[in-house]
Amino acid sequence: MENEYWKCSGHGTFVKAADGKDYYLYHAYNKKTNVFSGRQGMLAQLNWPAKNVWPVLKEKSGPSLNRDLKLNFTRPQIDKNWQWDFRNSTPGILQKNGQLHLSGIINKDNLSGIALTVRPTSTTFEATTTVTNTNSALKGLVYYGDAGSAIGIGIAGNEIEFWKVENKTRTVFAKVRIPTTVPVELKMKTADDLNLLVSFRKPNEEWQNVQAKEKITVNFLPQRDRSPRIGLLFNGSVSQDADFSTFELKY
């Protein structure tokens, strides 16, 4: 099935609802974000117009929901939206007293670190977090495709760092030394053309952009079945951790 908004539908399952109606639960790619945002869940009703004819699938639109996500880590249970790359790291995740503590073991060939992420429903979004601890590990935000394709902003010691990993090479676009360290808020914002802006601030102060020498795009991140995720980053030793008090994703 294809319409004005969706394409390449398939790989679905027929289900019967409590009211006796038949539905097709499947996936498709959004035409606007193309393969960058990956497959998304779809639902269509199965109708039989008459005997001995092909069935008809009619898409069903659900209610419009607020897709924004805001987490403050007040409960011990981690949010069900979190995902991580188990092939390239073994994260340790602890929520306590309004803090999420992220640590763990990073595979030797993993240059990106541990990424605790959620799957965005659009290529354009604004993600923010608050880092609350100080050490030499890099702690912050990451837009993560896999261990060899990621980009982010973080703080290590008293330096803000804007970085990416591509083709097994880690590049630092810019560093900004700040007089005091934590807490510090970090932000990543993507645009329709896949350009990326990153910034930081102390709580209740103005945002300061971290400028690279050229425009930075995220179009190198994996697509289709490995569509990139946005979330929290820890890149340090097993004796360190990254502490966060907030994470927010807005569309």
Please give the residue ranges for each predicted region.
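Carbohydrate-active catalytic/glycan-binding domains of CAZyme proteins
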Residues: M1-Y251
